[in-house]
């Protein structure tokens, strides 16, 4: 390249402006990208560091794509499970309140929240059709037949249905997991599904 042509390119303001704009775009893109990655790392560290219930309350891989019906019997409500978090953080789970329990029983057993949250939780679940209440045992079985869950978690001793299960229920519910009234059995079976 001749000297005259080099001098013209050095004096050309359009070329300098284009180079400045390109450098600015690259710098801004890098800063945005690095801040985005930093935010993700901070969020990951928070969830790892918390070790809290939100991180632990995920449905086990075996049950992620299955619909689950959990009967909130007296034994389940009195267990040591974090029911408040399970009720709010479970997406494909429907909770059934059997005929022998009322909303007040549910409210009394989902503790560790202030009064306002405790009384709003069942209403929120009812409004989202995650909590169904039946008035008798026949209604309970009709709910199950209409829901057709893949898995049913029930303490049949609490409901008094150990010997009264309809024969055709297995046509509507693929897997029935019967839970004993023992708190350890309840915690073991339910935590294997709801707590990672």
From Swiss-Prot:
Annotated compartments: Peroxisome membrane
GO biological process, one term: peroxisome organization
GO cellular component terms, semicolon-separated: peroxisomal membrane
Keyword terms, alphabetized: Membrane, Peroxisome, Peroxisome biogenesis, Transmembrane, Transmembrane helix
Pfam families: Peroxin-22 (PF12827)
Segments passing through the bilayer: 15-37
Record's bilayer topology term: Single-pass membrane protein
Major site of localization recorded for this protein: membrane
Family named by the database record: Belongs to the peroxin-22 family.
Chain's role: Involved in peroxisome biogenesis.
Protein name as it appears in the record: Peroxisome assembly protein 22
Species for this entry: Debaryomyces hansenii (strain ATCC 36239 / CBS 767 / BCRC 21394 / JCM 1990 / NBRC 0083 / IGC 2968)
């Amino acid at each position: 390249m001749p000297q005259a042509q080099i001098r013209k390119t050095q004096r050309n303001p359009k070329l300098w402006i284009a180079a400045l704009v390109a450098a600015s775009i690259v710098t801004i893109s890098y800063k945005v990208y690095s801040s985005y990655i930093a935010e993700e790392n901070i969020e990951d560290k928070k969830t790892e560091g918390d070790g809290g219930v939100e991180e632990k309350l995920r449905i086990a891989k075996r049950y992620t794509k299955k619909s689950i019906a959990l009967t909130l019997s007296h034994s389940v409500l009195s267990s040591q499970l974090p029911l408040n978090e399970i009720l709010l953080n479970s997406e494909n789970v429907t909770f059934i309140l059997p005929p022998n329990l009322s909303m007040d029983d549910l409210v009394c057993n989902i503790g560790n929240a202030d009064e306002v949250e405790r009384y709003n939780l069942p209403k929120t679940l009812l409004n989202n059709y995650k909590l169904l209440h039946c008035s008798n045992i026949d209604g309970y079985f009709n709910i199950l037949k209409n829901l057709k869950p893949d898995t049913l978690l029930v303490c049949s001793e609490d409901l008094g249905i150990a010997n009264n299960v309809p024969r055709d229920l297995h046509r509507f519910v693929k897997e029935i997991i019967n839970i004993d009234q023992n708190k350890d059995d309840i915690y073991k079976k339910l935590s294997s599904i709801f707590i990672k």
